[in-house]
Amino acid sequence: HVRVSFPEQVGNFKEEEVLMSTIYVWIIAMFVISIIIAVVRPMIKGKVGEAAVSLLLKQLASDKYKIVNDVILSSEGGNTSTTQIDHIVVSVYGIFSIETKNYKGWICGTENAKQWTQSIYGHKYKFMNPIHQNYAHVKALESMLRSNGYEAVPIYSIIAFPGDTTLKVTANKARVVKWGAVVDTVKNLSDTVCLSDDDVEKITMKLMDREAEKTQLREHINEIHEVKV
């Protein structure tokens, strides 16, 4: 007698189909996760760097230096675009615009180059010249100051990298230093009084108002999203 086992074969086929579907789902999930990590990781690294420099800046005397972090200003020219500044230090000696980078390895670049190079673990990566990036921040600050009646206030550009970075950079218009040298750099540039204590308070409040506006905008956007959901 011949025994027919079609039901068993069909069952095996379905099990294989389910297994393959599961494998495909896992592959797609891992692909999506890898994309998310690739996008989010630089953001996390950037925020870690900003937090480290923000903590170091607290070493500055609070009666002489006012610190405002993560400020969004309108770009120069009064258009609708904006620019985000990691740290602004306001003092009677002028204003310091600090751009924080969390890139390790060897950093090579010049003041006028469009891109700089990071060399690490035998690989080279290009990134935007942070001096150019901070120049846009300086111009935005100048525009904001002019609109509030402040002319010719010195604004110093500082670019900060981690302590274990090797810097091979030539620059005159900006100070390119390591995180641990940021405070001393600010102090070394603090040689001529150009603003009154009252001016420092007013400018700081203007920057903090911008921060409050940014927070309100984020809350408003979140509320809109919640309504849509």
Put a short name on every predicted segment.
Residues 108-110:
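Acidic/histidine-enriched active-site and ligand-binding environments that engage anionic O-linkages
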Residues 1-19:
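Short, Lys/Arg-enriched N-terminal segments with co-localized hydrophobic residues
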Residues 13-83, 90-95, 104-106, 115, ...:
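Surface-exposed interaction regions that form or flank ligand-binding interfaces
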